């Protein structure tokens, strides 16, 4: 009897160190993402794209693919709407639109706050790019100025909210964030003091809303 107890105890302890596969879920559209009704897979891998890759080809910060499955890779590139790997969520930039602008290919990191989704991507369009405009580019102008501006945009990130009805992206600037913080005067007061609408600023307020909603 004692031998069985010892054996079970050893198995229990060793089980704590067994490798655990990450939960991987693919969502075909926004409805599936909202309702958490996706397809579970086990072979996906996430790769952070380099700055040079983004500068040359545009698109999101992450490439998500699988090994030796061309059909699934094609689906991930062109048709898949979003992917969740454990607690990390990514949306397919190919599916996103901000006014008449597109975000290219690959995937963008996404936050789930309340019943809304916010993804982090390069600034596009006049409203967004104004938040990341390099002062050097404004001074120089011409081809050199354009090159500096393009390089600055590769590194710049802002947040967009996915409209749950239309699926289109809405830029999350200070005005939008102020509306989201309605009912939290202390956070609104802090936001008024901010000098930037960049992602590294806005993420603090999105995280605060996440905590308040828990």
Question: Where do the PLM segments sit?
Answer:
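Bacterial Sec-dependent N-terminal signal peptides
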Residues: 1-26
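General "foldedness" signal
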Residues: 10, 15-19, 173, 183-186, ...
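Aromatic-patch recognition
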Residues: 24-187
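C-terminal partner/receptor-binding element of secreted or periplasmic proteins
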Residues: 178-214
């Amino acid at each position: 009897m004692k031998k069985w107890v010892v054996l079970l105890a050893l198995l229990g302890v060793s089980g704590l160190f067994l490798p655990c596969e990450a939960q991987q879920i693919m969502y075909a559209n926004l409805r599936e993402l909202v309702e958490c009704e996706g397809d579970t897979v086990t072979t996906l891998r996430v790769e952070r794209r380099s700055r040079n890759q983004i500068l040359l080809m545009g698109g999101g910060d992450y490439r998500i693919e699988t090994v030796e499955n061309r059909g699934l890779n094609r689906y991930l590139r062109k048709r898949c709407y979003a992917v969740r790997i454990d607690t990390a969520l990514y949306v397919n930039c190919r599916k996103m639109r901000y006014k008449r602008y597109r975000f290219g290919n690959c995937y963008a990191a996404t936050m789930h706050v309340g019943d809304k989704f916010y993804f982090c991507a390069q600034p596009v369009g006049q409203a967004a790019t104004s938040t990341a405009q390099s002062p050097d580019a404004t001074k120089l102008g011409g081809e050199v100025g354009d090159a500096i501006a393009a390089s600055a945009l590769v590194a710049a990130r802002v947040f967009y909210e996915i409209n749950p009805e239309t699926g289109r992206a809405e830029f999350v600037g200070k005005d939008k964030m102020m509306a989201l913080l309605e009912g939290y005067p202390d956070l609104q007061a802090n936001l008024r003091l901010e000098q930037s609408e960049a992602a590294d600023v806005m993420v603090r307020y999105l995280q605060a809303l996440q905590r308040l909603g828990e």
